[in-house]
């Protein structure tokens, strides 16, 4: 006897009003992740995944494009207010925040959560160009 096809229900997107934008800005790339208050990821984008390769990945414009892409995906969840947490010394720190603001999000507060060692690991040797 033929098995009746089971109907796959359309997955309902949860609606989240407040979110947290985690920005990891390294010297080589910028990663933008938007989560809910509990830390569950809603959307993410990187400068490398946005079509920039090599040294163009580490530009403020690449970080801006990544933030815009991440913001578009987060808007599908109904995110309106963002708390921004920035980590790292990279060139995409400020442009990412500006792009999220221009995308229509209300930024409630900005936190610099860059990890600072209490004299932990030895840093890389200085470059000789």
Curated annotation (Swiss-Prot):
GO cellular component, as recorded: ribonucleoprotein complex; ribosome
Domain of life of the native organism: Bacteria
SUPFAM superfamilies: Translational machinery components
Matches recorded under PROSITE patterns: RIBOSOMAL_S11
Gene3D superfamilies for the chain: Ribosomal protein S11 (3.30.420.80)
Record's keyword terms, sorted: Ribonucleoprotein, Ribosomal protein, RNA-binding, rRNA-binding
Pfam family, one: Ribosomal_S11
InterPro entries per UniProt: Ribosomal_uS11, Ribosomal_uS11_bac-type, Ribosomal_uS11_CS, Ribosomal_uS11_sf
GO biological process, one term: translation
UniProt-recorded Gene Ontology molecular function terms: rRNA binding; structural constituent of ribosome
PANTHER family, per the entry: 40S RIBOSOMAL PROTEIN S14/30S RIBOSOMAL PROTEIN S11
NCBIfam families the record matches: PRK05309.1 (NF003698), uS11_bact (TIGR03632)
Annotated function: Located on the platform of the 30S subunit, it bridges several disparate RNA helices of the 16S rRNA. Forms part of the Shine-Dalgarno cleft in the 70S ribosome.
Complex formation: Part of the 30S ribosomal subunit. Interacts with proteins S7 and S18. Binds to IF-3.
Family: Belongs to the universal ribosomal protein uS11 family.
Name the record gives this protein: Small ribosomal subunit protein uS11
Species in which this protein is naturally found: Photobacterium profundum (strain SS9)
């Amino acid at each position: 006897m033929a098995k009746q096809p089971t109907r796959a229900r359309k997955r309902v997107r949860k609606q989240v009003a407040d979110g947290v934008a985690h920005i990891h800005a390294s010297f080589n790339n910028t990663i933008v992740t938007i989560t809910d208050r509990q830390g569950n990821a809603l959307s993410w984008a990187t400068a490398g995944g946005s079509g920039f390769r090599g040294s163009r990945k580490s530009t403020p414009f690449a970080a801006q494009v990544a933030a815009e892409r991440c913001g578009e995906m987060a808007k599908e969840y109904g995110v309106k207010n963002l708390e921004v947490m920035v980590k790292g010394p990279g060139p995409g720190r400020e442009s990412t925040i500006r792009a999220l603001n221009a995308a229509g999000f209300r930024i409630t507060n900005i936190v610099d959560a860059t990890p600072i060692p209490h004299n932990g690991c030895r840093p890389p040797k200085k470059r000789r160009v």
